[in-house]
Amino acid sequence: MIQVIGVNKTFGKNQVLCDINAHFDQGKVNMIIGQSGHGKSVLAKCIVGLHEVDSGQILFNERDFTVMNRSERTDVRKEIGMLFQGSALFDSMTVEENVMFPLSMFTKMTKKEMQTRADFCLDRVNLTAASKLFPSEYSGGMQKRIGIARAIAMNPKYLFCDEPNSGLDPKTSILIDGLIKEITYEYNITTVVITHDMNSVIEIGDNIMFIHQGKNWWQGGREDIITTENPEILSFVYASEFMKEIRTSMQQRRK
């Protein structure tokens, strides 16, 4: 579990995060949604230590990341898997070498052990046959699957996904969502997904946080976000035709 307690963050005179309180549950797909420029990515970067907070606490299973020394922070970062918006894969490395990369950086595993682990992770995303090829030989959807394999290579306790469906067609998005959900439940990971994709929110979101103007305006489950009357959330939700249909259908069933 991850807890965010009273977190504030400014850049110059601009306060980007204002007294944020939130919780992200273990074994659940936790989603951060909201309009662009309202603090979603900044919050995620603060949680994983890419930005320092001005004040507040970030607890990883009750361990306060903000007061840890460098060595302690490194140990926590080893427990975090990252799936980036862009694939962030190394074109000069094979698929297998990409998955092995964090293992080579942060473990003392032998090459054989790393290959075995990489093969296991690639098999988990149905890409075993791709191990000796290069990422550039694959579509965006397959590159995302390679990214997932790399993200779970270290057997993480926490998984952060930044816009995992960005640039993907609907069919591929459903596949990526399914993998994220399966891995979260199978390994009991605390997963945090930053997204604009309301389809994903309804399909796999267990715990949803709506951030607006740098504040946590609302947090709840998918049923709650479908039925909420909060005007700021509604303005964001109704930008999705899919969500309009879902809300209309639910309202009709309740009549």
Residue ranges and their predicted role:
Residues 159-162:
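Catalytic Walker B motif of ABC-type/P-loop ATPase nucleotide-binding domains
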Residues 153-157:
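A short, proline-enriched helix->beta-strand linker immediately N-terminal to the Walker B motif
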Residues 64, 111-129:
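Conserved ABC ATPase "signature" region
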Residues 134-138, 142:
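Conserved ABC ATPase signature
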Residues 48:
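Helix-to-loop junction immediately C-terminal to a conserved catalytic motif
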